[in-house]
């Protein structure tokens, strides 16, 4: 996680948690002159649009006062959804046995994209089974990882 994301996580997660939600993860996406700050929230009872609005109002106030982002951006508060992104080792561990789609920052063993069964986590490596071949992907090389929802 970059130092900017760590700073945002440290600033925003306590606000989300004080409202009774889990801060699932934070993304900051640079899009030219305008960027996107996306905060994923979760709750045991699920997330409704009213929950997102409530958290967004609180986070907006904190962001206005603390001003941690020097460029123009849009704040988006969202549920992680069924194809939820994975951010932490604990989230990978909780989803062992699920199908995942992983994109790396740079090629590993000749490829950047992996789609398969999340077999486990070994220290700082994510174990993924793709076409009967097991890959140990260093978590710090993962750019993006999402659960592939099952509809059965």
Swiss-Prot record:
It is found in: Cytoplasm. GO terms for biological process: ribosomal small subunit assembly; translation. InterPro entries: Ribosome_maturation_RimP, RimP_C, RimP_C_sf, RimP_N, RimP_N_sf. GO terms for cellular component: cytosol. The keyword Cytoplasm applies. Required for maturation of 30S ribosomal subunits. Belongs to the RimP family. This is Ribosome maturation factor RimP. It comes from Stutzerimonas stutzeri (strain A1501). The lineage of its organism: Bacteria, Pseudomonadati, Pseudomonadota, Gammaproteobacteria, Pseudomonadales. The gene is rimP.
């Amino acid at each position: 996680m970059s130092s900017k994301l760590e700073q945002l996580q440290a600033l925003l997660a306590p606000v989300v948690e004080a409202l009774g939600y889990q801060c699932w993860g934070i993304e900051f996406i640079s899009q030219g002159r305008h960027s996107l700050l996306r905060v994923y929230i979760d709750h045991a009872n699920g997330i409704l649009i009213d929950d997102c609005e409530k958290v967004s109002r609180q986070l907006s106030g904190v962001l206005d006062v603390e001003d941690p982002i020097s460029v123009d951006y849009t704040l988006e508060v969202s549920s992680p959804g069924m194809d939820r992104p994975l951010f932490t080792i604990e989230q990978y561990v909780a989803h062992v046995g699920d199908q995942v789609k992983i994109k790396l920052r740079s090629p590993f063993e000749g490829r950047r994209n992996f789609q398969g069964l999340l077999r486990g986590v070994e220290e700082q490596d994510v174990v993924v089974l793709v076409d009967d071949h097991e890959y140990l992907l260093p978590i710090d090389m993962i750019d993006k990882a999402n659960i592939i929802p099952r509809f059965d």
